[in-house]
Amino acid sequence: MNDISQKAEILLSSSKPVPKTYVPKLGKGDVKDKFEAMQRAREERNQRRSRDEKQRRKEQYIREREWNRRKQEIKEMLASDDEEDVSSKVEKAYVPKLTGTVKGRFAEMEKQRQEEQRKRTEEERKRRIEQDMLEKRKIQRELAKRAEQIEDINNTGTESASEEGDDSLLITVVPVKSYKTSGKMKKNFEDLEKEREEKERIKYEEDKRIRYEEQRPSLKEAKCLSLVMDDEIESEAKKESLSPGKLKLTFEELERQRQENRKKQAEEEARKRLEEEKRAFEEARRQMVNEDEENQDTAKIFKGYRPGKLKLSFEEMERQRREDEKRKAEEEARRRIEEEKKAFAEARRNMVVDDDSPEMYKTISQEFLTPGKLEINFEELLKQKMEEEKRRTEEERKHKLEMEKQEFEQLRQEMGEEEEENETFGLSREYEELIKLKRSGSIQAKNLKSKFEKIGQLSEKEIQKKIEEERARRRAIDLEIKEREAENFHEEDDVDVRPARKSEAPFTHKVNMKARFEQMAKAREEEEQRRIEEQKLLRMQFEQREIDAALQKKREEEEEEEGSIMNGSTAEDEEQTRSGAPWFKKPLKNTSVVDSEPVRFTVKVTGEPKPEITWWFEGEILQDGEDYQYIERGETYCLYLPETFPEDGGEYMCKAVNNKGSAASTCILTIESKN
């Protein structure tokens, strides 16, 4: 079209005169040849223009198809990025912990992804409809402009054609000698010239109409091809049904089919991705099973092999194996808990006061738990410790009982001496001194009572010290009274009855003191028993921590050995770092915590690009929320549990994934009861 407009401008702007003065005298045959030559020249020009126009349209179509393809790739990349962002946001959202199976969780995730895909497709459809409307308006404007240009060319076409025809005449036609009958020739030539001009005008109009009809389907075809680039077969099928009145309906159908194809493709990709994740998860779980159990399971599978039903048999055996493992783990945990309860109750019954016991048991436990590889079972070690502790506590209890018997005999002897002294007091005659002694004894008893109440609040050493001081002071007072009574006894022989009756007060005072001593001893025993139980609990917790530390150390050594075997050397670690795949600088470690206390799992992960971290518990993913909180600081990632329960104990896993690879680290959380 640009070539036509340029030629039209050149012809209109040219000031070349048309040679009308010289008209050669030709015969009829020469006029016919001239007309045929002009016709051929016109057809060649039209063919050349049509070829140029087709070539230009073909190049434009190729450019548009390439541009649409690139634009489609960019849109798909953006859509995939949006899908990844949306999926990561959905994982970060707080979702309560589901108690269903893994299949149910995958179904829920599939529903969420389908909903997001549906929303995205609706937005894309709206955007494409708007874009198509804009393109339609643009094409209509271009068609209107082109129609105006064609009309302009038609208006100026007759003049240009006549000029070109005259030029061709000047170039191709050679004049010959004219006939002498000039009158006839002039008349015939004018008639022929009129007929020729009329034919040229009619033919030019027909040519213009044909060219316009040729351009209309080509424009429509270019539009349809630019809009529908995904499926060439469908586009060819739709070209047959294209008509001016049904263009919009056909485009909508094609758009709907394209959206459906995209939706199906996205669903297939999501389904494949879910299947790959399931397979990876199942493979990770199978790798964590012990080798012995795997050998047994494989033997069972081979025994249960049936030709033609391999898949069904394997699934049945796998289900049975999982149920057996779960039942064995529950029985083992129940048996271990019962043994620990029995051992703790037995140790609690046989526990006796031992101030030096924490240090002694600490040294003993340290002697038993020497660093290195442990060759003994921890349950057997715990049983041996409990037996030795039981035997030692029995010996100490016997020794303490003998010591208490000796102290009781000594106290009874002292009480007997005091009773004899009280009988000697009954023989006294000095009533006033006895009354004074009685008063002083009651006052002393009150003072002793207040002192014993204060002493009860002191420590055990201070209590023993105070008792010894009080006994020494009482012995001194008793000796002084004995000396006075002995002197008075030698002076007088008569004995009054009333003073003897009054002397019962010191005896009753001594009896009350004995009861007081018994109460004090009982209170002291109860307090010591309570302290013993606390020390026993602390000692058992300390031993449990040491056992857990030994277990953890053993596992760390095994992991280091496995890591050295798998990784080989630091050079391989450097190669892994350069590759960009995620790997754990600081893996998870086994942890034990008291019930209802918080716990934190910490790892250090590196990778390029930055890996995506997820936490798992017993094969189920943990969502970020109030119960399980995700914490991220640079390369350090934490899982924080603000409160723990007995059912939180088990295996935790941290999984890091990026486009270069994946890595995982596991640990065992042990929940200890408060009692």
Curated annotation (Swiss-Prot):
Tissue: Abundantly expressed in heart and skeletal muscle, and at lower levels in placenta, lung, liver and pancreas. Also expressed in HeLaS3 and MOLT-4 cell lines.
Impact reported for residue 611 to T: In CMD1CC; affects cardiac Z line integrity; no effect on protein expression and stability
Record keywords: Actin-binding, Cardiomyopathy, Cell junction, Cytoplasm, Cytoskeleton, Disease variant, Immunoglobulin domain, Phosphoprotein
Consequence of substituting residue 652 to C: In CMD1CC; affects cardiac Z line integrity; no effect on protein expression and stability
InterPro entries: Ig-like_dom, Ig-like_dom_sf, Ig-like_fold, Ig_I-set, Ig_sub
UniProt-annotated stretches for the region Disordered: 1-66, 105-127, 254-278, 313-336, 487-513, 551-584
TM region(s), chain numbering: none
Skewed-composition ranges (Basic and acidic residues): 27-66
Associated disorder: Cardiomyopathy, dilated, 1CC: A disorder characterized by ventricular dilation and impaired systolic function, resulting in congestive heart failure and arrhythmia. Patients are at risk of premature death. Cardiomyopathy, familial hypertrophic, 20: A hereditary heart disorder characterized by ventricular hypertrophy, which is usually asymmetric and often involves the interventricular septum. The symptoms include dyspnea, syncope, collapse, palpitations, and chest pain. They can be readily provoked by exercise. The disorder has inter- and intrafamilial variability ranging from benign to malignant forms with high risk of cardiac failure and sudden cardiac death.
Residues recorded with modification Phosphothreonine: 370
Name assigned to this protein: Nexilin
Subcellular location: Cytoplasm, Cytoskeleton; Cell junction, Adherens junction; Cytoplasm, Myofibril, Sarcomere, Z line
An example Gene Ontology molecular-function term: cell-cell adhesion mediator activity
GO BP annotations, alphabetical order: axon guidance; dendrite self-avoidance; homophilic cell adhesion via plasma membrane adhesion molecules; regulation of cell migration; regulation of cytoskeleton organization
GO cellular component: actin cytoskeleton; adherens junction; axon; focal adhesion; plasma membrane; Z disc
Cysteines paired by S-S bonds: none
Function in brief: Involved in regulating cell migration through association with the actin cytoskeleton. Has an essential role in the maintenance of Z line and sarcomere integrity.
Organism the protein comes from: Homo sapiens (Human)
Superkingdom classification of source: Eukaryota
Residues recorded as bearing Phosphoserine in the entry: 80, 241, 357, 365, 564, 569
Any Pfam family hit: I-set
Domain Ig-like: 582-670
Outcome recorded upon mutating residue 279 to C: In CMH20; the mutant protein accumulates in the cytoplasm but binding to ACTA1 is not altered
